[in-house]
Amino acid sequence: MTVKLMKDQDLAGKRVLIREDLNVPLDGGRITSTVRIDAAIPTLKAALEAGAKVAVMSHLGRPDEGVYDAAASLAPVAKYLSEKLGREVPLVQDWIDGYSADADLVLLENVRFNKGEGKNDDALAQKMAALCDVFVMDAFGTAHRAQASTHGVAKFAPIACAGPLLAAELDALGKVLDKPARPLVAIVGGSKVSTKLSVLDAVSKIADVLVVGGGISNTFVASAGNEVGNSLYEKDLIPEAQRLRAQTEVVFATDVRVTKEGFKEWSHNSVAVAKKASEIQADEEIVDYGPETAARVAEIIKNAKTVLWNGPCGVFEFDAFAQGTEVVARAIAESEAFSIAGGGDTLAAIDKWNLADKISYVSTGGGAFLEFVEGKKLPAVAILEERAKA
């Protein structure tokens, strides 16, 4: 794919509007993970160093569109940026019809406070475009949404280009999906086959080995004729699991950790017992890979040249159910393969064991990451490609 890049543009003295994904989790107004903001900061610094007058826009949360909601304000993000950059980053309210600011870097209040954002309204997008000489799309995490601040504005801005973060995401995913070094091992976890079926289909066509974890693995365990007790699985998708197994090499749990506790009783004091998948009882629930499966997956990763990871192998939020995910995560971190990881739960697992700097590329995208892996066109990237041809 060919898009214009921010690094190739003359930004000196220009008004540069940058769309970032600063949709961070908040707890009582306090940011609980700054990963997305930290990932965006190099782009902001690069634009400032190039002499640009920078305005940053983002969404946060799911407020009712067109209505101000203090709980969805980007004020905590502006405060964090100010602290991190050592300069005041003003938060600009009511900016859509133009604003005045002396600062070289401002944060525009939540784009979702503008009516028409979600429907990609042309009139709104034109107002956004009027605020800049150069529009920079740098929010991979929202690239799968055709909205005014991700797609529409790129249609109308004088210049529309990809920022360093977006470019790096596309480059990293391209290394996995276009011409990967082989063997390519894809690890897909999560709770349900149904929510990841298109991903499983897509990666089964390019991966040398497909490893499944979590509730997805449970459905495959059942497809092999095993009792799965009270485990989360999808009986109606057993034929799909069997089809995938016939299509490619699929690795799923042959031993598991189980508990007899109901999920409402799970705690950090819970206990899980390891056993063969063929020995699961009707009153037991699978919560993790068993040690043999985890070791087998780690060995597969050790021999890989490329690793794609999306989704945990068990209920890693509880330490008693986390061993499988930890073994796999550490194997990826220690591997010499090019590795890319994406998805919210995957990032949480990486954070849990502080492994981010040992993964080749950690994607900030959730839905966008999955849609790209599925081979879908991302609207925000497609419009940048169109503009690059013009």
UniProtKB/Swiss-Prot annotation:
Substrate binds at residues 21-23, 36, 59-62, 112, 145. The keyword Acetylation does not apply. Signal peptide: none annotated. Its main location: cytoplasm. It is found in: Cytoplasm. One of its GO terms (molecular function) is ADP binding. ATP binds at residues 196, 317, 343-346. It comes from the Bacteria. It holds the Pfam family PGK. The keyword Kinase applies. It catalyses: (2R)-3-phosphoglycerate + ATP = (2R)-3-phospho-glyceroyl phosphate + ADP. Its EC number is 2.7.2.3. Pathway: Carbohydrate degradation; glycolysis; pyruvate from D-glyceraldehyde 3-phosphate: step 2/5. Coiled coil: none annotated. One of its GO terms (biological process) is gluconeogenesis. GO terms for cellular component: cytosol. Belongs to the phosphoglycerate kinase family. PANTHER family: PHOSPHOGLYCERATE KINASE, PHOSPHOGLYCERATE KINASE 1, CHLOROPLASTIC-RELATED. This is Phosphoglycerate kinase. It comes from Cellvibrio japonicus (strain Ueda107). The gene is pgk.
